From Swiss-Prot:
Keywords: Capsid protein, Late protein, Viral capsid assembly, Viral contractile tail ejection system, Viral genome ejection through host cell envelope, Viral genome packaging, Viral penetration into host cytoplasm, Viral release from host cell, Virion, Virus entry into host cell
Protein name stated in the entry: Portal protein
GO cellular component: viral capsid
Gene, per the UniProt record: 20
Subcellular location: Virion
Taxon lineage: Viruses, Duplodnaviria, Heunggongvirae, Uroviricota, Caudoviricetes
Pfam families hit by this protein: Portal_T4
Role summary: Forms the portal vertex of the capsid. This portal plays critical roles in head assembly, genome packaging, neck/tail attachment, and genome ejection. The portal protein multimerizes as a single ring-shaped homododecamer arranged around a central channel. Binds to the terminase subunits to form the packaging machine.
Length: 511
């Protein structure tokens, strides 16, 4: 931790030398726990532990993550999560899972080659080919993911060790000073608190005693990526996950499925009705007589919502609750009849409705949800079209990938600076131009490109009669076919070359 402590000392020195002052702290975009103080940490390594008390309406991180993980165990939610993760992390035999695009950066070719080498090293440390699916799914479900950077003697990362998100907390210490009677913000110092124990320490306990179960970690020692979704007031925001929208529809779907099974078990079979002749027995003895007969033939069936099993004492599923009605002497005598079962037990439209509602809450096209006559999914065939929902879903997945790429770019930044490949200033100037490209499904991409090209060809045929009269050929190339100037020049050069090539010349029959 000595390297990270030194880095934190440099951050403190930057705060001291920073001439910028403001009455407001920078926006809290990472959901950090804020501490306001007029003094920085007197001694690095000693924890400054925030109070365990939660603001009104704030859900503890541990409870939030537990609720998301429990939700992900429902098979309908798990299927929906798999749709998202499969779209974000694509495995193909001849392609990498993720690669780096440096075309828009200001680096030289030599520097770009070194950056790509370090990028491959980081991808290898994360084992994206093997564990990329697991990391992305864990990040999506928990709404956050942490890795500890473990260094060798040369300060190179040799391992990225995953940490339990329920034991981590990001703290932002807001350094203030008073100028002319006005309290202004001098700077901010961020660090992590790792809670070794789940025991909730009282706020009055000293920092020394609290540090026995919690300790402070410099910010640069941890790789942290979160969903980017916030809830709570501006003074105390906290991170929520993308599954937060799915909690209500998922619980409604599960409740409806359980209720539907119970209803069908109760109403599907025909029930027996026993009319028991009690003769002239007194009311009390008549009731005892009916109860005796009932106990001899009674069978109660219980449905277990946890396992989906039907349990009873006799293990006979054909029998349910029966009706026992006494009859007085002079009636028809003892009789056993049946009540018909329920009707329309095959209707599951309400279940399919809540299943579609769950997919909508998770921003997944409802065409991928299972329906009554098909299993769901994307179907491309003759005349098939890519719907607007699919395009919106593709954009949503790209936003998720952009949030997740911090898992790769954070350790990449460390490697580049430690090995003196680039400076921190060069990273700050170019990191927005550096693109982490995730592999996409080839079949889907080809189908999308073919559909776009087909639409452009149809539009070009419709406007062909007006070419050279109302619209120039260059206008058609740039606005209908969407070709760039370089593409137009290259295309014209290829056309001129093919005109002199006998292979592309037509014969007398037009071939």
């Amino acid at each position: 931790m000595k390297f990270w402590t030194k880095e934190e000392e440099q951050d403190i020195q930057k705060i001291e030398k920073n001439p910028v002052r403001s009455f407001s702290a920078p926006d809290n975009v990472d959901g950090a726990k804020e501490i306001h103080t007029n003094l920085l940490a007197p001694q690095l390594g000693h924890a400054i532990i925030p109070s365990d008390a939660q603001s009104e309406g704030t859900i503890p991180v541990k409870e939030l993550i537990k609720s998301y993980r429990a939700l992900a165990e429902y098979h309908e939610v798990d299927d929906a999560i798999q749709e998202i993760v499969d779209e974000a992390i694509v495995y193909e035999n001849d392609k990498e899972v993720v690669w780096l695009n440096l075309d828009n950066t200001d680096f030289s070719e030599n520097i770009k080659a070194k950056i790509n080498e370090e990028f491959d090293r980081v991808v290898s440390l994360l084992q994206m080919r093997k564990h990329g699916y697991k990391w992305f799914r864990k990040w999506y479900v928990d709404s956050r993911i942490y890795f500890h950077k473990i260094l060798d003697k040369d300060n190179n990362i040799i391992e990225l060790r995953p940490l339990n998100p329920m034991k981590m907390e990001l703290v932002r210490e807001i350094q203030k000073e008073t100028i002319d009677g006005v309290e202004v913000v001098k700077g901010t110092l961020e660090y992590y608190v790792y809670k070794q124990s789940d025991y909730k320490m009282p706020s009055w306990m000293s920092a020394t005693n609290r540090a026995q179960t919690s300790f402070r970690i410099p910010k640069d020692a941890i790789v942290f990526a979160h969903s980017g979704l916030m809830r709570g007031c501006a003074d105390d925001p906290y991170i929520i996950g993308y599954l937060d929208r799915a909690i209500k529809p998922a619980n409604q779907l599960k409740m409806l499925e359980d209720a539907l099974v119970i209803y069908r078990l109760a109403r599907a079979p025909e029930r027996r009705v026993f009319y028991v002749d009690v003769g002239n027995l007194p009311t009390q003895k008549a009731q005892q007589y009916v109860n005796g007969i009932m106990q001899n033939v009674k069978n109660r069936v219980v449905y277990d919502t946890q396992t989906g099993q039907v349990k009873n004492t006799t293990n006979a599923m054909s029998m349910l609750e029966d009706y026992y009605l006494p009859r007085r002497e002079g009636s028809k005598g003892t009789e056993v009849s049946t009540l018909p079962g329920g009707q329309s037990l095959g209707d599951i439209e309400d279940v399919l409705y809540f299943n579609r509602k769950l997919y909508k809450a998770m921003r997944i096209p409802t065409s991928r949800a299972a329906s009554e006559d098909q299993t769901g999914g994307i179907n491309f065939g003759q005349g098939a079209e890519i719907t607007r929902d699919e395009l919106k879903f593709t954009k949503f997945v790209k936003r998720l990938q952009t949030k997740f790429e911090t898992v790769i770019t954070d350790p990449l930044k460390h490697q580049l600076i430690v090995n003196n490949i680039i400076t921190e200033e060069e990273w700050d100037a170019n990191h927005e131009k550096l693109y982490v490209v995730f592999n996409q499904d080839s079949y889907f991409e080809e189908a999308k490109e073919l559909e776009i090209l087909n639409s452009r060809m149809n539009a070009m045929r419709d406007i062909q009669d007006y070419a050279g009269k109302y619209y120039s050929h260059k206008y058609i190339q740039k606005n209908i076919l969407r070709l760039s100037d370089d593409q137009i020049t290259a295309m014209q050069s290829e056309i001129d070359e093919e005109e002199t090539n006998p292979r592309f010349q037509q014969d007398d029959q037009g071939f």
